[in-house]
Amino acid sequence: MAVITVDFQLCFIFILVWLFSLFCLSAFFFKKSKDPQLQDCGLPPSPPSLPVIGHLHLLLSVPCHRSFQKISSQYGPLLHLRAFHIPIVLVSSGSMAYEIFRTHDLNFVTRDRTVPIMEKSILFGSFGFVSAPYGDYWKFMKKLLVTKLLGSHSLEQTRLIRGKELKTFCAMLFDKAAKNETVDVGIEMMKLTNNNICRMIMGRRCSEENGEAEKVRGLVTKSLSLVKKFLIASTVGRALKKLGISLFEKEIMEVSQRYDELLEKIIKEHEENPNKKEDRDMMDVLLEVCADDNAEFKITRNQIKALFVELFIGGTDTSAHTTQWIMAELINHPEILKRLREEIETVVGKTRLIQETDLLNLPYLQAVVKEGLRLHPHTPILVRNATEGCKIGGFYIAQNTTMIINAYAVMRDPDSWEYPDEFQPERFMVPPKRKEDEREQLALNYIPFGSGRRGCPGTNLGYIFIGVAIGTMVQCFDWRINGDMVNMEETGEMTLRMAHPHKCTPVARINPLASFESRNP
């Protein structure tokens, strides 16, 4: 059962929604669609609704992914919902998600701007890449990200950086083990991923000494809480977006200002001390494009800042919390932990630390990571918008319909996954002789990072972060917890987080760092 957090602001939103609905009864209740196809019987089935608000009460239930899963199991995998007069289609089937992400990818490549726009905010303004419309700016920025940061060649160039950070992380765990101190896995993983992201995109860590690193981590956490509030507020429909802005404007601008001050300082450092051509980071590349009047696309200073905010949030939070979930699953399933450790010791040995280059030779580790992402996708709800009317699963989807793809439900669908709620990495150990269509069927229902053109461009980096972190913690340590099992309760937030911090004590078993130091005095 999930832990649900209800604060005053969310209650206030709900009260305002009800008051607003009374004043707007005639406008919303009697509005008829002008699309003749909507008057046919081609729409997806719809569960019972309430007068005026439609299915709003279902959309505001938390945690959303579990609420949506319950609705779909009762009424079907493709459902037509309504928040006032706003059409919404809920998708809980892998085959229908495939139609959206592949067959009709261009039609659904635009993300519905559920979060209100504040022009002066680098957090929820119009400068971001993630929520940008599909067009020249989005294509240009994605190309830059792939070629300069997230592509295979770029990842190979920054491998040494991540290797050093992994050793620092491992040394910290050995220090905790020596002192018999408890580790908050989520917090320590957030530090590791934040250090990696910062060094990869701007050439240096955020300083722990002057509080800069803690400031970034705090901003990431605060940003995610604001996204949660806005997504819940925005489910009432486009008509209430301005209301949402008025409720949270002070918080948004405060966080945006803190991001702006931090990033402006970093930008000025790069401008005053530009890196040499052979040692350039992402910030250097972006500043060069910003200053180049002949660039393929002219980007602004605020767009650079907004991109870095998105990289901080996406790169830091996703890997940190997914690793926390997977370690909890491994501790709760000691037989799987044992098998994984045996694989690592067979391939890597005991005298050196696991490396990124080992991952391809560790199929069971890959399966463990995939199974963890299947059960605990960081973003369980994916949102798209229909640019034009089309048919999905034989049903008509009207233009401008908001599509909610419940990735959580798709990856726990009992029609597609055997024992869907159980942690079984073996399901991803696909034998080479298995038919190709079986492999495709597996991939069809596996969407932890989304899919299509709007799929997460940092998928490969995410697998690397999570894989080597899990590998290190399993290779070098046993883990002691209070009680027999890790508590697996979820929060009621928009991202899938553990309700209770995953705290455990590392117990050193082998120290490949000591072996390395003895060979390299």
Predicted regions mapped to residue ranges:
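Cytochrome P450 heme-thiolate "Cys pocket" and heme-binding signature region
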Residues: 309, 430-466, 491
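Cytochrome P450 substrate-recognition site 1
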Residues: 36-59, 65-161, 185, 189-196, ...
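Conserved cytochrome P450 K-helix/beta-meander segment immediately N-terminal to the heme-binding cysteine loop
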Residues: 359, 405-437, 520-521
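Cytochrome P450 heme-thiolate monooxygenase catalytic core
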Residues: 112-122, 156-323, 339, 491-493
